[in-house]
């Protein structure tokens, strides 16, 4: 049972999402509706995209804490290009390229220059945030064209065009990681770096690709953010990196690398977003959101740690069971033999 839970964490994440959807329905029947699902999904799109990118990095046994700054920087570039008169497709492509380059730079620092990921991305977190503020002068970007907002307008079944694009990306990335040799390279790199090199996996290239795609996902999240609210504050993206990592951990992506599924990260992002909607239903002030999400994350980390310890004890017990078996009891000599000896 313990091994099943450990190997199928996305199932437990799905159960948590279902429970968090059903239980509030006892307080308000209107909460149990398709409208609620589409509303939560619309709010979760940014975090889902960031969790997808973070999954790739975490599978290679690294971590990126600069994605929030990349999201803000890319959103600012998008707004500046649109206000300068560039078309929406050109602005979006330039934004995605900027995110890709920012992620590539992170990957170079980690894979080629051998700087620990947490240190490298802490540095670029400040760098990208500084670039964002230099471009804007600390001001908000407003007056974005109406065509940008159309990207987040309901299109089919209450889901926007960018929402359908997110669904397609989730399906493609799930297939890529589960069914292709290239996707499995991320798992191998994170699970056993030296073993992966001996198998011929280009581990440095895989890690750079992971960081680059992570940056691209952050740029796409910046586009979604700008299209949803119609303006870009000077603190866009602040704190999103921690939520993305939390979503991955909640969905079963291991901080030690080499295990987890993209669906689990998506469910973790959905769960964190759904907490916000439940708090609104319960009329709990918004400043409780981060506190409750943090408590949930700590509970999951404690549970995950205890589960790993229990599995390791069980494996050790099975491995050494034959050495720990008590010796067979010695049969006492029969009374007849005792008389003959006498």
UniProtKB/Swiss-Prot annotation:
Disulfide-linked positions: none
A Pfam family of this chain: BPD_transp_2
Keywords of the record: Cell inner membrane, Cell membrane, Membrane, Transmembrane, Transmembrane helix, Transport
Primary location class: membrane
A Gene Ontology term for the protein's cellular component: plasma membrane
Residue spans, topological domain Cytoplasmic: 35-38, 91-92, 136-154, 234-251, 305-342
Subcellular location: Cell inner membrane
Record InterPro entries: ABC_transp_permease
Segments on the Periplasmic face: 1-13, 60-69, 114, 176-212, 273-283
Membrane topology: Multi-pass membrane protein
Residues spanning the membrane: 14-34, 39-59, 70-90, 93-113, 115-135, 155-175, 213-233, 252-272, 284-304
GO MF, one annotated term: transmembrane transporter activity
Top-rank taxon, per record: Bacteria
PANTHER family reported in the protein's UniProt record: ABC TRANSPORTER PERMEASE PROTEIN YPHD-RELATED-RELATED, AUTOINDUCER 2 IMPORT SYSTEM PERMEASE PROTEIN LSRC
Family: Belongs to the binding-protein-dependent transport system permease family. AraH/RbsC subfamily.
Subunit structure: The complex is composed of two ATP-binding proteins (LsrA), two transmembrane proteins (LsrC and LsrD) and a solute-binding protein (LsrB).
Function: Part of the ABC transporter complex LsrABCD involved in autoinducer 2 (AI-2) import. Probably responsible for the translocation of the substrate across the membrane.
Name assigned to this protein: Autoinducer 2 import system permease protein LsrC
